[in-house]
């Protein structure tokens, strides 16, 4: 080989050799650590933070391990104090090399161990602090060109997140569109919890995610579409606290603590405004003692209507069934939609007393032990309501049924109503406990059967009634106008035992007629 050929060959091979040496050098630990030091120093200067990495290990082709990553920035209010934005013990990622040349990413392994994080003032909407024991995922099918991503498996273990929402959020003026579509095969969340604080720490919500599994998900971030084939949440907890409200006995709407949550959901679909979900299983306990043994059913909502199908709810001693369909414009003044509801329930004394925490002890003690049966079947809106069936029965105490219709039921100036009521009372001693001691010595509530027809026209009320008690009977009509305070009554009684209602006045049976008419009298 001539000298010229040697020089030509050398010139040709030199860049190749240099590239190969650099490629090999990048897998040498000293070179890797030197490069990391240079990169972290540059990043620290540009970002105004202290960024450090203890150790890096890159194994051919793209199996990367990083240890001891720390990101620190000055505190936004105390100059001499520093905030740790991130503290990562170890991260490992194994990426296939050749798919990268086709704009595809195949991740055989991505593990993050022992992460501490604090967004400080980096995110205006909220401050997020927390720890993460392990994040592990596999992803085969990330296409950077088509903006699609498949997660074969994702697992989160030991996450503790605390989110404090901000009350002053600057408007987001950036325009960006996210076309990514994500397919999820399997997600596991273990031993984790999330706490959210509303601005000013007025409200606080904490969710414990001890064991959550989700399968077969699809998320279209551009359309805002979210689908999941199934979600199972076991050993869950939810705590809700209004921090400025006192704690009350019994069921307290301002301080709710749910535990032992087991939730199973199928066929979840959300793409605003459409929502559909099948509740396969739901059970939980509340700190007041209320136990939800089972809840099943289906909920479907779109831009115009909410439909609750075959809702079945049970506690250990109570149950409820419901079928409800509500047009979302049912409250509109002009051209309102319709609401249809068919509800039946059997409510035990144990469950009712849990909701009566502030009722007198005597009332709760004397409430009958039998379950309270409730039925309601109605349809209508704020212009017109038809009640085809309404019933409440407490065996041994009372049974009340009603049916009728009303125009403008929520407007006392325009309301027009026509209802038929049928009530039978038995032992209502527990009701007497709500009266003062003086009235308890004077008033009695005997077993009575009453039938009434009630008509309302604005604030004018007409009632015709038929009351039977013991051997006596009373028929009558009454009228009252709340605007004018005018009233009238016509009563026809036969052997009506007044002493059964008014004690200690030596009254007896009354037979006769009475007529009353006036205006502005104070009945009390």
Feature annotation, model-predicted:
Residues 110, 154, 343-345, 376, ...:
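Membrane-embedded beta-strand positions of outer-membrane beta-barrel proteins
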């Amino acid at each position: 080989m001539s000298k010229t050929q040697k020089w030509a060959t050398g010139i040709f091979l030199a860049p190749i050799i240099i590239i190969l040496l650099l490629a090999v050098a990048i897998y040498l630990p000293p070179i890797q650590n030197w490069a990391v030091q240079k990169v972290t120093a540059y990043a620290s200067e540009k970002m105004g933070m202290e960024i450090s990495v203890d150790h890096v290990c890159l194994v051919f082709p793209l199996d990367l391990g990083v240890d001891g990553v720390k990101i620190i920035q000055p505190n936004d209010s105390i100059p001499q104090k520093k905030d740790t934005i991130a503290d990562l013990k170890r991260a490992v990622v194994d990426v296939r090399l050749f798919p990268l040349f086709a704009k595809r990413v195949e991740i055989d392994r991505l593990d993050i161990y022992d992460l501490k994080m604090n967004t400080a003032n980096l995110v205006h909407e909220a401050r997020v602090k927390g720890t993460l024991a392990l994040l592990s995922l596999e992803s085969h099918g990330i296409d950077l060109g088509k903006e699609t991503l498949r997660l074969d498996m994702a697992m989160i273990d030991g996450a503790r997140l605390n989110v404090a929402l901000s009350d002053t959020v600057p408007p987001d003026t950036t325009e960006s569109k996210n076309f990514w579509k994500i397919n999820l095969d399997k997600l596991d969340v273990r031993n984790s919890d999330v706490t959210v604080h509303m601005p000013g720490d007025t409200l606080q919500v904490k969710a414990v995610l001890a064991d959550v599994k989700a399968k077969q998900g699809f998320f279209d971030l551009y359309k805002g579409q979210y689908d999941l084939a199934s979600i199972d949440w076991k050993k869950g907890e939810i705590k809700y606290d209004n921090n400025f409200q006192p704690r009350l006995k019994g069921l307290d709407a301002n301080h709710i603590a749910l535990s032992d949550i087991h939730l199973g959901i199928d066929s979840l679909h959300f793409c605003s405004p459409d929502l559909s979900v099948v509740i396969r299983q739901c059970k939980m306990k509340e700190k007041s003692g209320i136990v939800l043994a089972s809840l099943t059913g289906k909920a479907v909502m779109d831009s115009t209507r909410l439909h609750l199908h075959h809702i079945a709810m049970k506690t250990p001693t109570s149950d409820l069934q419901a079928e409800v369909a509500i047009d979302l414009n049912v409250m509109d003044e002009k051209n309102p939609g319709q609401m249809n509801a068919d509800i039946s329930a059997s409510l035990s004394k144990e469950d009712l007393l849990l909701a009566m925490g502030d009722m007198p002890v005597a009332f709760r003690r004397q409430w009958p032990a039998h379950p309270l049966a409730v039925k309601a079947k109605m349809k209508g809106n704020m212009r017109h309501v038809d009640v085809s069936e309404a019933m409440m029965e407490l065996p041994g105490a009372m049974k009340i049924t009603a049916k009728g219709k009303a125009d403008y039921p929520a407007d006392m100036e325009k309301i027009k109503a026509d209802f038929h009521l049928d009530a039978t009372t038995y032992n209502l001693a527990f009701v007497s406990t709500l009266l003062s001691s003086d009235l308890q010595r004077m008033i009695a509530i005997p077993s009575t059967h009453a039938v009434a027809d009630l008509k309302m026209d604005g604030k004018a009320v007409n009632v015709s009634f038929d009351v039977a008690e013991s051997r006596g009977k009373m028929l009558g009509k009454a009228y009252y106008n709340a605007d004018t305070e005018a009233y009238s009554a016509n009563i026809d009684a036969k052997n009506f035992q007044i002493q059964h209602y008014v004690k200690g006045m030596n009254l007896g049976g009354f037979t006769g007629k009475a007529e009353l008419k006036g205006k502005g009298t104070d009945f009390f």
